[in-house]
Design a protein with these regions (language model features):
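Conserved N-terminal phosphate-binding loop of PLP-dependent enzymes in the Aspartate aminotransferase
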Residues: 1-187
Length: 187
């Protein structure tokens, strides 16, 4: 943010996937103490309804005049009502706090599993890298067979983005399924 200020550049942050409590703060950039000029958001903003939005500082917003920008999912009354309800729910229930607390708990449990090389997470955005003997796709398929939906994003990496209302008990169940899957792959 200082670099942008020093060089008279705008700082734009994309919070489409990471915004609205996912990373343990209302917006992910808030974890870093930076001040963007424009923030884009979608996905969690609508609670399942199609909507996208941007927020801008007052100074930057002056540049937006009627017809100077467009949107695919902006402004629909039903989606806007859903977004307002969703934002109230996220903030009133402190789902950012839950994401941080449960995300830290989940990561600590995952780090203890066999063959885990590294767990990377921020809130409830969680990646697990396994050693070279365990394939991410194999873990994904084994977990799916055990009714846990995850994704593989590399040869040895899985990613999980649980709901913001997930509990520690539900994370324990997920860890048990992943551990069972890993053990089945060792054979």
């Amino acid at each position: 943010s200082k670099f942008c200020d020093d060089n008279e550049m705008l700082l734009l942050i994309d919070e489409v996937q990471t915004g609205w409590c996912r990373t343990g703060a209302v917006m992910s950039y808030m974890n870093y103490g930076i001040k963007p000029d424009i923030v884009s958001m979608a996905k969690a903003l609508g609670g399942g309804m199609p909507i996208g939005a941007i927020c801008a500082t007052a100074e930057v917003a002056k540049a937006f005049t009627a017809g100077s920008h467009g949107t695919t999912f902006g402004g629909h009354p039903v989606s806007c009502a859903a977004a307002l309800a969703e934002v109230n729910e996220l903030l009133d229930r402190d789902l950012a706090g839950n994401a941080k607390k449960v995300g830290d708990y989940f990561a600590a449990k995952l780090e203890k599993l066999p063959h885990v090389k590294e767990v990377r997470h921020q809130g409830l955005l969680v990646g697990v890298e396994f050693d070279d003997t365990i394939g991410g796709v194999d873990v994904k398929h084994g977990c799916l067979d055990r009714h846990l939906l995850i994704t593989a994003i590399g040869a040895h990496i899985i990613r999980m983005i649980p709901p913001l209302i997930v509990t520690e008990e539900e994370c324990d169940k997920a860890v048990a399924i992943i551990e069972d899957t890993i053990k089945s792959l060792e054979k």
